Amino acid sequence: MEYSGMKEIVWGVWKERENMNADMKWLDNPEVFKVNQLESHSDHCYYLDYSDMKKEKNPLLQSLNGQWEFAYSKNVMERPVDFYKETFDASGFDKIMVPGHIELAGYDKIRYINTMYPWEGKEYHRGAYSMEATGAEEGMFSEAQYNPVGSYIKYFDLDRSMCGKRIHICFEGVEEAMYLWLNGQFIGYAEDSFTPSEFDLTPYIKEKGNVLAVQVHKMSTAAFLEDQDFFRFFGIFRNVTLKALPDVHLEDVWFKPVLNQDNVSGRVSTSMKVSAPDSQHVTACFILKDREENVLVEKSIQLTKENGHMEGTICADLENVKLWDNHNPYLYHAYVELKAEDGSLAEVIPYDIGFRRIEIIDKVVYLNGKRLIITGVNRHEWNARTGRCIGIEDMKADISCMLRNNINSVRTCHYPDQIPWYYMCDDAGIYVMAETNLESHGSFQKLGAIEPSCNVPGSI
């Protein structure tokens, strides 16, 4: 079965790269930061029907959190090269819990660094293409004497509810560079410690007896950009989840609620990108409800094929809009229903949205036409025992602490937080300044002292 939106983006990639091997030189190359990684998309949940939304566990998701096999190596040269093969004997491996930091499991060393790069004083590194590099970038991480490697293996069977569907895997956070294999086949490579990395496993996954192998490297060229003022860890420190995709699936969605200048009326547009079998005609229905579950909007369109996907946008106007702010964080319940050609429900997507308008007038910030007074804090994801590997209860405790102390805003210093945090802030009425994973002051502190091409983008 061929799918709009999958044939070109996924199947075509696999046909071209099915014999590709993992290359350790990617660690040294700033132009290679992902291989076979799927496109980023919205953070929505999806279900086969409304009844699944009420279940404790979504039948389309399977967590791989828990105990994994593990081996620690000081550098690339000492790593177990063939550990990803199905015939590999991992009896000599240790056990490690995922998610978690490798350092807090008893390996390597815990380090806190502010403005320096972690290799300074030990090895000479300059960013690729800088005039001072003179070839130093060749092998600077793949051949470094100190660049620890964590080799993980997970054995698993696919849940019955997942069988027969397209299967993706999502790593919500891996610090700092990762290689991925399934059943002996190379799947992909990714950098960026604080955003999800998603890969398609469909061509190689089995119902039973799967061997998933992940190799995590503490440093790569991404380290030039991830020079935050914090503890330096590595490993799989956020959730790992298998995702089963229905035949008709919402790949990406953008809800855009707009509050008009009268602060009474509003408009919401919902843009969708859907994958479906090429022969399918798909209808999308947008439903908006208030807190009391009264239906305010219900509109449908037939999606059209655009750029290899099924796409469409639904717009709706509202009157007597209830506003969102920190005093009354009112959220509406939005739903997208995708229906197959015979009218049957193929997938349902719930999402809460709010109406608010932010403006800057004469250097003053206004929210919904009123001056906004911000009482905010910087917040790291942090637990005194588990580091940046935190859970829902840690987030709830932070929200509770902020509300008790009349704090109405938070800055996610210095990286994207786990996705549930943003939902919690919506619910609690917390304004969010969301930072990207970019801090390179290890280069700008030398500004004027060395040749300026050494300064990494983002530092000046």
Describe each region flagged by the PLM.
Residues 257-266:
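Short, solvent-exposed loop/linker segments at the N-terminal edge
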Residues 68, 184, 240, 332, ...:
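Conserved, mostly hydrophobic/aromatic
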Residues 237-253, 355-370:
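Low-complexity, Pro/Ser/Thr- and charge-rich linker/hinge segments at domain boundaries
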Residues 8, 12-43, 51-55, 60, ...:
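Accessory beta-strand-rich segments of carbohydrate-active enzymes
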Residues 180-182, 265-303, 312:
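Beta-strand-rich binding/interaction modules
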Residues 213-215, 333-337:
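Extracellular recognition modules
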Residues 162-165, 205-209, 318-331:
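Short glycine/proline/serine/threonine-rich loop/turn segments at secondary-structure transition edges
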Residues 176, 194-198, 202-203, 223-224, ...:
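Active-site mouth of glycoside hydrolases
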